[in-house]
């Protein structure tokens, strides 16, 4: 499946690819041969060093504050940026907990060259997700998320809901829990699947 995706990317003359989860070395040679720029998402210094050794063109540095798939070590964005910047001059895109110019300026001061926002755009006017999801973000607080599945991996950060309360108490999550993601995003059923969002919900007060 991944090989097919790679072939399509090359055939369609895509110029920029972001990879994540694991070692990019297995993909990067083919992508670079096709003159494609590759940024790899990393949640740790060790992951960044591995990606640098593999020959990536840049890094998306993801702090624990962000929503979605996370590293169980829970290292914050600014510690990560500064730690990684000491080892490379490659472009760094900061991700996790950024919703506005203040967060962007802080990321730049720490050593980033760009930013990536997820939760903020989920709760934007242009976002196609259901109003229930947007409302849960706007009405949430910085303490309104869990990191789930820390004992087993992969971990995810998601909003506190009836569903995630149960998953958190049990300690383990089957990835099939994400199968209802369309019903969550577009049907508005907040318990159809874990609602992936970051701690930045505490900074978002309106759509």
Regions found by a protein language model. Give the residues of each.
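Active-site entrance/lid segments in N-terminal catalytic domains of soluble metabolic enzymes
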Residues: 2-87, 91
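Conserved acidic functional residues
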Residues: 41, 96-97
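Acidic, glycine-rich active-site loops and adjacent beta-strand->loop/helix elements
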Residues: 65, 97-98
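Conserved active-site-proximal phosphate/metal-binding subdomains
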Residues: 71-93, 99-207
């Amino acid at each position: 499946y991944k090989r097919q995706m790679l072939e399509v990317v090359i055939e369609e003359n895509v110029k920029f690819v972001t990879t994540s989860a694991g070692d990019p070395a297995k993909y990067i040679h083919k992508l670079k041969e096709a003159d494609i720029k590759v940024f790899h998402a990393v949640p740790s210094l060790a992951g960044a060093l591995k990606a640098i050794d593999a020959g990536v063109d840049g890094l998306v540095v993801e702090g624990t504050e962000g929503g979605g798939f996370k590293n169980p070590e829970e290292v914050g964005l600014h510690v990560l940026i500064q730690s990684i910047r000491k080892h490379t001059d490659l472009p760094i895109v900061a991700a996790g907990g950024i919703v506005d110019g203040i967060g962007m300026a802080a990321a730049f001061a720490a050593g980033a060259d760009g930013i990536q926002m997820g939760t903020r755009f989920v709760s934007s006017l242009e976002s196609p997700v259901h109003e229930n999801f947007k409302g849960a973000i706007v009405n949430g607080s910085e303490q309104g998320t869990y990191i789930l599945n820390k004992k087993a991996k992969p971990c995810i950060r998601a909003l506190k809901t009836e569903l995630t309360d149960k998953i958190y108490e049990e300690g383990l999550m089957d990835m099939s829990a994400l199968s209802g993601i369309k019903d969550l995003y577009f049907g508005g059923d907040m318990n159809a699947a874990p609602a992936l969002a970051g701690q930045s919900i505490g900074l978002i007060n309106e759509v």
